[in-house]
């Protein structure tokens, strides 16, 4: 693969199988034209973008959740190399570091890539098998170092797919439709996570079968996504630069000029994800140690909450995504979603009962579903340099990972210091609220 210098290839006389190339652009606004071709997008290709995004997110979230929720933790308990919780925690902690670094690296590399298959497509394709190999090795590794190394390889493969896939929203989707496409992306993640929890639980007595199925899903994730998405334009040119390590190093500089709104979006996203994960990551313990259920009742409650989590996002994107595109606003849906999430967190804080946890699950995922609908669209709209979308979106995606890392650290500290979960709720509410307020200060989008 060759690396290029300068602006991305946008308006190129290359038609391939893209029907929108032949559509007239006269009378269309800039928001209706695809960034890479300067032409309107066809309904067929718009549908293919939606199908590709939702397929990708369902498969990668489902695959990650299938193994990590039940089969892998159960296997770690039988290895005799330490407590399962310690193994799982070490694996995730180090794996997150690789996820953080590789997301930015592959985003930058895809920005600079010059391939006849496009600048994003090759990375998405090769990421799947890398993740699949990493997961399979994790499922058979007998020692902690090999488990950690294998899981880190999975994170590299996963982010090799995520970084360029997210950048497609900026490269190839008209601004007018980004809310709707972001809706598919967000819904796919939530549905995939719920499906993974349900499917993973089914393989508690047949872990090897679950591991093989999960490995296959990982391997097919990238290629399946590429087949569903419209074909990317060639990024190869006669004057493309050969690989230059200095040129690649320059790709990793964080944006500075005109990046105020970009960093506001980063902080807002970090706070919202942090507040959201303070409760989501501890649902079982909250049910047992705060609501007062025994282990069996708590497991049943969490299982029911998973079903609620899967159903709600199926409805939200169909409504809120098109509404966001129609009204042309991103900040208002984020503020509304944050308010709903805050109310959802407050319900079990005030009312300790199983029913309050069900209400929490419904409101949390309603709010989070609305947020995910406009999240990626808002992020794309505040990019300082659209031609460096992969790198910039990779940096924004750090907020997701950091939020998930910081949340358990803070929650654990609160529980150790106070002996309970009571203070976790108001702090989570405050974090979500701060995130919403920060987003309101963005000037570049409405």
Question: Which residues make up each language-model segment?
Answer:
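A membrane-interface helix-boundary motif in multi-pass transporters
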Residues: 119-121, 202-217, 412-432
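Glycine-rich segments within core transmembrane alpha-helices of 12-TM secondary carriers
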Residues: 98-99, 179-201, 397-408
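Intracellular juxtamembrane helix-capping segments at the cytosolic ends
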Residues: 72, 160-173, 370-384
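Helix-loop boundary and gating motifs at the non-cytosolic
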Residues: 35-96, 261-268, 272-293
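Juxtamembrane intracellular "pre-TM" segments in multi-pass secondary transporters
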Residues: 24-47, 232-267
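Structural signature of the two symmetry-related core transmembrane helices
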Residues: 120-136, 332-347
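A late C-terminal transmembrane helix in Major Facilitator Superfamily
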Residues: 387-417
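Helix-to-loop junctions at the C-terminal end of transmembrane segments
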Residues: 103-117, 316-329, 415
